[in-house]
Amino acid sequence: MSTKNRTRRTTTRNIRFPNQMIEQINIALEQKGSGNFSAWVIEACRRRLTSEKRAYTSIKSDEE
C-alpha cells in the first residue's frame, strides 16, 4: 500500500482509468449538476464493497 501523501484518515492512490470511463464519469457528474470525481469514485467503491460483503456473508452462511 502506498503511503505517499498519507494523512491520518486518507491515503492518496494513483490509478489508471480507461479514457472512455473518465468521459462517462464526467458526463454523469455534469448531469448531476455538481459533483466531485473523488467522491464519485469513493461512493462507487463503497457500493462494490457492500455488495461483495453481502455475497461473502451469504456464501459463509451456506457453508455452515
Curated annotation (Swiss-Prot):
InterPro entries the UniProt entry points to: DUF3950 (IPR025030)
The protein's name: Uncharacterized protein YlcI
Gene name per UniProt: ylcI
